[in-house]
């Protein structure tokens, strides 16, 4: 399924992880306001969809790859994964996690 593949890509593509994912997680690490968290997370997800489409030559535009519901579910999945690092979700990942 696309959201799981995109989540795996976020965590395992070194270039994307270092340039976009990790800085986003650093920004939201101590944030408690959900709107601020989503304000950082959703643009990072959009960048990832673009990166994913370009890297794997996906014949869809990034905005057509996932519905807004799937993007929201992916955002929740990312946050859950970051907050519960001992629970392996879909991918093996580096150890920097939100506590």
Listing of model-derived features with the role each one plays in the protein:
Residues 1-99:
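Acidic interaction surfaces
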């Amino acid at each position: 399924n696309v959201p799981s593949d995109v989540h795996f890509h976020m965590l395992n593509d070194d270039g994307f992880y270092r340039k976009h994912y990790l800085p986003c997680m650093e920004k939201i690490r101590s944030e408690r306001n959900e709107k601020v968290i989503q304000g950082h997370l959703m643009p990072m997800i959009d960048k990832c969809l673009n990166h994913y489409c370009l890297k794997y030559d996906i014949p869809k535009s990034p905005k057509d790859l996932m519905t807004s519901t799937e993007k929201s579910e992916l955002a929740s999945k990312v946050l859950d994964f970051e907050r519960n690092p001992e629970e392996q979700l879909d991918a093996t990942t580096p150890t920097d996690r939100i506590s």
